[in-house]
């Protein structure tokens, strides 16, 4: 699984809209959409925050072994 797909899955499993997810990380809804569609990627500090907030290891996020 790609990073964008993992972010989308995490967000959807928690019942969050792109807008709500964006507010958690001080970015726009369009930025979240771009992450999920792999047009851009979160910076490392944001990835760490996502990892901590949703209890998903960075290794899982980056290597694409999210289940």
Task: Indicate where each model-derived feature is located.
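Short, charged recognition helix plus adjacent turn
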Residues: 64-67
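Short, Lys/Arg-enriched C-terminal cap helix and immediately downstream tail that follows
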Residues: 8, 44-45
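DNA major-groove recognition helix of helix-turn-helix/homeodomain DNA-binding modules
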Residues: 45-60
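Conserved hydrophobic/aromatic packing and binding residues within compact polymer-binding modules
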Residues: 7, 21-22, 32-35, 61
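Central "turn" residue of the DNA-binding helix-turn-helix
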Residues: 15, 25-26, 38, 55
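A detector for short, charged/polar N-terminal pre-domain segments
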Residues: 1-2
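Short basic helix-loop element that most often maps to the first helix and adjoining turn
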Residues: 5-24
């Amino acid at each position: 699984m790609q990073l964008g797909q993992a972010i989308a899955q995490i967000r959807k499993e928690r019942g969050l809209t792109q807008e709500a997810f964006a507010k958690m990380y001080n970015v726009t809804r369009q930025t979240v959409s771009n992450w999920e569609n792999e047009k851009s990627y979160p910076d490392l500090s944001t990835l760490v925050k996502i990892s901590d907030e949703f209890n998903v290891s960075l290794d899982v996020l980056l290597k694409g072994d999210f289940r």
